[in-house]
């Protein structure tokens, strides 16, 4: 059974997220956690606002969320899955690969990304793979598999 929250009471506050993930402005891309099963899956949101620095140059007059930042947001939600697994060594998990990532629609200021990640595999407590997808208003924006590795 998963832990979940209502729209008014997040499962994890921004402070709790910052205690679990090393990312900081401008790369802290998880605003709220809605569901979390350590070692299994997580669902979180990222609110897209015009005040974000990438929109100064991507693109003036037609701001679009860069695809690499959507993938990074998905990876950070994937990171929340493993950060509370008691048997894993502590350290920094980083990207090791990306498979089958596809972008299906633009993301613009005012959108709210709903990101769902599910752990697919974990090998030797150092290498893992998650299936990730991001939606806006129920419409698929991006999906793919993300691999990570523990850096000593």
UniProtKB/Swiss-Prot annotation:
Main location: cytoplasm
Keyword flag Cell inner membrane: no
Any one GO biological process: fatty acid biosynthetic process
Catalytic activity: a (3R)-hydroxyacyl-[ACP] = a (2E)-enoyl-[ACP] + H2O
EC number assigned by the record: 4.2.1.59
Pfam families in the cross-refs: FabA
CC annotations in GO: cytoplasm; membrane
Location of the active site: 58
CDD domains cross-referenced by the UniProt entry: FabZ (cd01288)
Family matches, as InterPro entries: FabA_FabZ, FabZ, HotDog_dom_sf
SUPFAM superfamilies linked: Thioesterase/thiol ester dehydrase-isomerase (SSF54637)
Class of this enzyme: lyase
Family indicated by similarity: Belongs to the thioester dehydratase family. FabZ subfamily.
Role noted for this protein: Involved in unsaturated fatty acids biosynthesis. Catalyzes the dehydration of short chain beta-hydroxyacyl-ACPs and long chain saturated and unsaturated beta-hydroxyacyl-ACPs.
Name by which UniProt lists this protein: 3-hydroxyacyl-[acyl-carrier-protein] dehydratase FabZ
Originating gene: fabZ
């Amino acid at each position: 059974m998963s832990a979940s929250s209502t729209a008014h009471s997040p499962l994890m506050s921004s402070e709790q997220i910052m205690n679990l993930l090393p990312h900081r402005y401008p790369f802290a891309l998880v605003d709220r956690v809605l569901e979390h099963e350590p070692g299994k899956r997580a669902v979180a949101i990222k609110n897209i606002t015009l005040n974000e620095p990438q929109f100064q140059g991507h693109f003036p007059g037609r701001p679009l969320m860069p695809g690499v930042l959507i993938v990074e947001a998905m990876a950070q939600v994937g990171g929340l899955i493993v950060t509370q697994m008691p048997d894993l060594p502590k350290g920094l998990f980083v990207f090791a690969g990306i498979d089958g990532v596809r972008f299906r629609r633009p993301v613009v200021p005012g959108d709210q990304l709903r990101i769902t990640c599910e752990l697919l595999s974990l090998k030797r407590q150092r290498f893992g793979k998650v299936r990730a997808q991001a939606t806006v208003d129920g419409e698929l924006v991006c999906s793919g598999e993300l691999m990570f590795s523990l850096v000593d």
